[in-house]
């Protein structure tokens, strides 16, 4: 019998990729919701939804992800990234459902010189990172057997993201300045969706925190250069700049590369190199 999977935030980048990877998979019966169908910041709405649906798995793709705006919208950011996670976890626990939560590399302060492991000390330097870490803690207090994926620099053909922005700017601007002293790894949302499917399809449930991004490491500047190279954009001069030269409201980690060893070992899985996934995504965007 097909297992029912509740996907929240279904209209976002990851939610849309989950639609595609679940399409035609007879082992799962997905329920896709966004704020119109289910307001996850309302405990009553969640409780009513669970009372009316049998749920085996919850995959929470909903979040407040506007990192700079979060500095001025602490309450809303907290409601979506922490309180809502707790409400979903409480409902999942009462109804015997398993839960997958998406978190972020921004739970770290970026002072490491090696890729971050799951047990490294967390120390977020932004409201966004702090609320995502609060969400992790609230989830594990309520549902210790949950799965948490910390990911980074998410992009896809859907919604607003860095890749689509740089494609647009590359075609409309003569020059661009992009930060070169923040290093991390981009994550193609499709790759993360497939990783979540590996969790759901596994013969046994492997709870815990996992780091997931594509393979490799790169700066925002070099990422932009790669986006333009792959898309054949030659009319825009991309210049490197420092974080100090481009101040933002929220502080960001200078180094947030994630160590994916635990995920790869646990699920016997390989992860694509960031440039291969970027090429596929740009292909999808350009051929829509």
Model-inferred region functions:
Residues 13, 202-249:
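Mid/C-terminal beta-alpha module of Rossmann-like enzyme folds, strongest
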Residues 79, 84-87, 94, 107-149, ...:
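Catalytic helix-loop patch of NAD(P)-dependent Rossmann-fold dehydrogenases
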Residues 219-225, 242-281, 285-288:
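Conserved C-terminal active-site "lid" loop/helix of NAD(P)H-dependent oxidoreductases
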């Amino acid at each position: 019998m097909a297992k029912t999977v509740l996907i929240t935030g279904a209209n976002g980048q990851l939610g849309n990729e989950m639609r595609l990877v679940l399409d035609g998979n007879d082992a799962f019966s997905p329920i896709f919701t966004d704020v119109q169908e289910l307001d996850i910041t309302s405990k009553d709405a969640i409780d009513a939804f669970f009372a009316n649906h049998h749920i085996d798995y919850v995959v929470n793709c909903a979040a407040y992800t506007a990192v700079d705006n979060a500095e001025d919208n602490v309450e809303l950011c907290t409601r979506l990234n922490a309180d809502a996670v707790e409400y979903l976890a409480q409902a999942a626990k009462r109804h015997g459902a398993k839960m997958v939560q998406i978190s972020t590399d921004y739970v770290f302060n970026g002072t490491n010189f090696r890729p971050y492991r799951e047990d490294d000390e967390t120390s977020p330097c932004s409201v966004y990172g702090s609320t995502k870490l609060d969400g992790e803690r609230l989830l594990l207090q309520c549902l210790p057997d949950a799965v948490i994926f910390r990911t980074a620099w998410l992009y896809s053909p859907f919604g607003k993201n860095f890749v689509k922005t740089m494609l647009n700017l590359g075609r409309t601007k003569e020059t661009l300045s992009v930060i070169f002293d923040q290093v991390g790894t981009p994550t193609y949302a499709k790759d993360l969706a497939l990783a979540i499917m590996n969790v759901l399809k596994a013969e046994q449930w492997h709870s815990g925190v996992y780091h997931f991004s594509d393979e490799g490491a790169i700066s925002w500047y070099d990422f932009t250069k790669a986006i333009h190279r792959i898309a054949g954009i030659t009319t825009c001069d991309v210049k490197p700049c420092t974080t100090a030269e481009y101040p933002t409201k929220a502080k960001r980690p200078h180094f947030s590369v994630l160590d994916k060893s635990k995920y790869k070992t646990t699920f016997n899985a390989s992860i694509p190199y960031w440039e291969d996934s970027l090429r596929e995504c740009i292909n999808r965007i350009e051929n829509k």
